[in-house]
């Protein structure tokens, strides 16, 4: 029998199941992708109400550089972006949208690279040029203004995105993903009524990671000291992998201590930002997240199909 489940945000920590292993995911176009160490799966809701799923095994990643602190962060991020791009392409094609038909692997890869470059410029370099242009001196004052500008850009962008009806639906799928992961991690039944009892925010969320990156960058840039011109730009670009690696370790640490005082403190900023990037899902959206999780779990089994497969599930 599944253990008694209490809301994640309740003062009494709910029981975690120790042997389920880590799981993550992301929201897709009218769908959800889930990932575990040995497999990934995705599901999308079709216009006729059916759910289409896909799943595939993943190569073992429990050895080598993926286990080394600081080095594992950038590798994990690269894996996440690569798989996220693959799942996004599949979702667009599976739904038969005009956008999906127009995508190609090369085109989507180029779009991802361009988006990454734009993010580095807008979130990495541009905020540092603001205090320099204003003539602000002193490492703490300079970096405080830089971080506030960076935070403002991030929150403003998320806020503008949330005004779009389609993005609001994607944010609801984001919430469904988190709630389903919570339910799985706590041994709950994978049904909409049971899953609804869980928080739509999660400590390992990529949104939380972005905010932790900003906070870690503040500390790292203060330690670097006062620089300007080309050196300033170089430190913001070349220092990004270091900042990302440290931020990954912070998120990993907080995720393993989510019910401790230090864990709650570390998770608080990211939890607040997830209030923007997640929305309460309806039962249809939760069903899609459940389908993605079940497809992922099935792909981990030795008897599962070793190659990606697609199946329609009646609504």
Regions flagged by a language model, labelled:
Residues 1-88, 92, 96:
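Divalent-cation
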Residues 256, 260-306:
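Cytosolic/matrix-facing juxtamembrane and C-terminal tails of multi-pass cellular membrane proteins
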Residues 86-94, 115-138, 213-235, 241-244, ...:
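Juxtamembrane "helix exit" motif at the C-terminal ends of alpha-helical transmembrane segments
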Residues 105-122, 202-214:
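Select subsegments of transmembrane alpha-helices in polytopic membrane proteins
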Residues 41-43, 50-56, 129-136, 157-191, ...:
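Juxtamembrane helix-loop transition segments at the membrane interface in multi-pass membrane proteins
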Residues 68-72, 145-171, 240-256:
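Hydrophobic alpha-helical membrane-embedded segments
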Residues 70-88, 130, 176-183, 199, ...:
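Hydrophobic alpha-helical segments of integral membrane proteins
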Residues 31, 167, 205, 273:
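Residue-level signature of catalytic and energy-coupling elements of molecular machines
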